């Protein structure tokens, strides 16, 4: 501990989300970056709170103003941030619909959400049917520009579309120019529409830089909920640190497809922080991006 540090002691369990150095054995960080962890919690469970659950929590509570009973739509509901959204939304007493492939529907249902098979059904039409034409109060979309346009159609008056990734760029299903046009609509054109709907893009690192105390408070809340036994993240796999490089290449989507419905425990390192940009980041720790567009947007705090 540094000479000016107070409120912490050697041996205390603390959590942080370093942008660089997350795989090292020892790391020097600013004392005001760390959040104390409740005594006795599984450190692997605590890891889950830092990225996936904080992302989900801040989108649900900071980006949106949701009330118990409100309906939301979660894309990629079987993924890391997706399952965090499902569990936290259940705690907030929200009605949840989640798009996922059929192999993940039991996992989605285990969180009390209604699955939508995006491969064999039009999710826009399904939301219209399930909500009797009312739409949902919020959509959380990690897919990308083309999907944002369709998701916006699902938003009810007074609701919000929150983009937080661009997965289809990494799979080649969407071009970079198409994604940038999607950003233009998400952050510009749709905000000018007088239709009572709103849109935004969420990035955990840029928000943390701008609002560090908010970030610490939110992580502390999640750690407390974890310590109280209110949160039980879905498990993909836990790997030793020495296998971290191999873990980065692991097909995360397939891992979640193989989860036993209702299984509970830590996601841990093997979760791989896949959804900082919907899977567009090759390594959050090294800052290596798969597409120049994502690096450009990240550097500008998007």
PLM segments and residue spans:
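A glycine-/small-residue-rich N-terminal strand-loop-strand element
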Residues: 1-19
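Short amphipathic alpha-helix with an adjacent loop that forms part of the alpha/beta core around
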Residues: 123-133
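Glycine-rich phosphate-binding loop and adjacent beta-alpha segment
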Residues: 146-230
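Conserved class I S-adenosyl-L-methionine
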Residues: 268-302
């Amino acid at each position: 501990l540094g000479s000016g540090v107070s409120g912490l002691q050697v041996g205390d369990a603390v959590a942080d989300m370093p942008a660089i150095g997350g795989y090292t054995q020892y790391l020097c960080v600013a004392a005001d970056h760390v959040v104390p962890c409740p005594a006795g919690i599984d450190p692997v469970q605590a890891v889950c709170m830092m990225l996936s659950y904080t992302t989900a929590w801040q989108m649900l509570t900071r980006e949106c103003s949701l009330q118990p009973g409100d309906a939301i739509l979660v894309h990629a509901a079987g993924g890391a941030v997706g399952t965090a959204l499902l569990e936290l939304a259940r705690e907030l007493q929200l009605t949840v619909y989640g798009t996922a492939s059929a192999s993940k529907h039991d996992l989605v249902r285990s969180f009390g959400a209604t699955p939508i098979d995006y491969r064999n059904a039009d999710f826009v039409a399904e939301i219209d049917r399930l909500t009797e034409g009312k739409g949902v109060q919020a959509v959380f979309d990690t897919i990308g520009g083309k999907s944002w346009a369709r998701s916006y159609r699902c938003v009810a008056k007074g609701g919000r579309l929150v983009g937080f990734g661009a997965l289809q760029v990494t799979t080649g299903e969407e071009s970079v120019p198409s994604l940038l046009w999607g950003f233009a609509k998400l952050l510009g054109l749709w905000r000018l529409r007088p239709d009572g709907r709103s849109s935004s893009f969420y990035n955990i690192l840029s928000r943390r830089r701008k609002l560090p105390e908010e970030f610490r408070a939110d992580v502390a809340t999640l750690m407390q909920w974890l310590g109280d036994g209110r949160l039980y993240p879905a498990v993909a796999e836990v790997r030793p640190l020495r296998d971290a490089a191999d873990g980065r290449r692991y097909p995360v989507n397939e891992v979640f497809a193989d989860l036993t419905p209702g299984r509970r425990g830590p996601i841990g390192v093997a979760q791989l922080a896949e959804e900082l940009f919907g899977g567009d980041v090759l390594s959050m720790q090294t800052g290596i991006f798969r597409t120049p567009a994502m690096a450009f947007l990240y550097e500008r705090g998007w």
